[in-house]
């Protein structure tokens, strides 16, 4: 079909006031020949078709009206002095989280989160086990989903970083738990968000790129490399960047 999007009905969901699209340099070198920006509204197919815009107004993830107001002001770049004062009221420099409530400390930089996690792990009087990722092909270090060398102990607080795609749906990206048993082959995690202990298996991540066939003008996905590791990371602390999109 010569119709936009092949004549297929398309539903697009997103928020333009979130982070801009992430486009690799080599991909943009190709795409910039055809598009003015990496945003979807620069799509030529979109400009050739009629579309209806629907704005969702009901918020379900938050119920606190004051907090919602602060979030919306930040999102719209309208935060003022009163907004800052409201946030500062929540600042409690002497707060010590209860050990059994699994608080997560958000940090601005990876090294800060790493230092906190290493210190908390060292405080556990138990044997440490190390698991090394299996990396094949091209998989840049900045794209590693978790540590290449993952050191864990029984009693460590961990976060799952991938959804369980099996029928059981035992864990999801952002779920917090504690390692209850561990050996050189693997470990078991207990979480209040699942009804039984979870025997964790290694997962596979793919590093893909999209390649344009100049002759057919078709775009195909090409897997350049894979990363195989247990889908967890230490979770006493995590960077703000990595916390985006997670539920915990």
What name fits each language-model region?
Residues 1-248:
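Conserved ATP-binding/catalytic motifs of P-loop helicase motor domains
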């Amino acid at each position: 079909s010569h119709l936009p999007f092949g004549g297929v009905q398309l539903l697009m969901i997103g928020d333009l006031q979130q982070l801009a699209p992430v486009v690799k340099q080599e991909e943009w070198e190709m795409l910039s020949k055809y598009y003015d920006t990496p945003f979807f509204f620069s799509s030529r197919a979109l400009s050739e078709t009629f579309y209806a815009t629907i704005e969702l107004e009901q918020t379900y993830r938050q119920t606190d009206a004051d907090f919602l107001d602060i979030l919306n002001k930040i999102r719209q770049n309208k935060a003022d002095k009163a907004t800052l004062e409201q946030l500062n009221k929540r600042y409690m420099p002497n707060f010590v989280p209860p050990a059994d409530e699994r608080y997560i400390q958000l940090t601005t930089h990876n090294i800060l989160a790493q230092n906190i996690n290493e210190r908390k792990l060292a405080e556990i009087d138990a044997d440490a086990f190390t698991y090394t990722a299996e990396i094949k092909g091209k998989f840049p270090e900045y794209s590693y989903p978790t540590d290449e060398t993952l050191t864990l102990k029984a009693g460590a607080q961990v976060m799952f970083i991938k959804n369980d795609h099996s029928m059981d749906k035992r864990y999801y990206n952002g779920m917090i738990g504690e390692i209850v048993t561990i050996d050189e082959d693997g470990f078991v995690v207990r979480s209040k968000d699942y009804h039984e202990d979870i025997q964790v298996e290694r997962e596979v991540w793919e590093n893909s790129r999209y390649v344009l066939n100049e002759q057919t003008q078709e775009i195909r996905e090409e897997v350049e490399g894979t990363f195989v590791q247990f889908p967890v990371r230490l979770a006493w602390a995590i960077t703000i960047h990595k916390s985006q999109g997670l539920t915990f």
